[in-house]
């Protein structure tokens, strides 16, 4: 749900009262992406989503080539566990090779949520 093309880019609309290029630059430079460091706004956004959607656990899926998200996963885990929620990080290249392993890890994670 919180991914590069997910809800995050829709949180703050483009300011239509500014010159268009300035407004677009402001919009894109304020998207809480892991390449923008420090990225405290993403942790705040995750914290708010946990409360808003009353989740029991968070699954973070990281594309293997996205090193900044991989590094940031430490902070995501910290944010989630500080709220007393379960956390699972899955790193994948979206190929079929790790399909079975991911399935097993998801099943185990869901079992822990049921307890």
Q: Each predicted region: which residue ranges?
A:
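Residues that form generic nucleotide/phosphate-binding pockets
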Residues: 27-28, 49, 105, 112
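Peripheral docking tails and interdomain loops at the edges
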Residues: 74-115
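Redox- and metal-dependent alpha/beta enzyme cores, enriched for Fe-S-associated oxidoreductases
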Residues: 1-38, 42-45
């Amino acid at each position: 749900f919180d991914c590069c093309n997910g809800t995050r880019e829709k949180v703050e609309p483009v300011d239509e009262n500014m010159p268009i290029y300035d407004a677009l630059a402001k919009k894109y430079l304020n998207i809480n992406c892991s390449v923008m460091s420090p990225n405290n706004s993403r942790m705040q956004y995750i914290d708010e989503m946990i409360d808003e959607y009353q989740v029991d656990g968070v699954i973070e899926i990281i594309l293997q080539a996205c090193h900044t998200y991989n590094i940031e996963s430490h902070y995501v885990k910290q944010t989630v566990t500080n709220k007393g929620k379960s956390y699972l990080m899955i790193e994948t290249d979206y190929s079929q090779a790790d399909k079975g392993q991911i399935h097993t890890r998801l099943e185990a994670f869901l079992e822990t949520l049921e307890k």
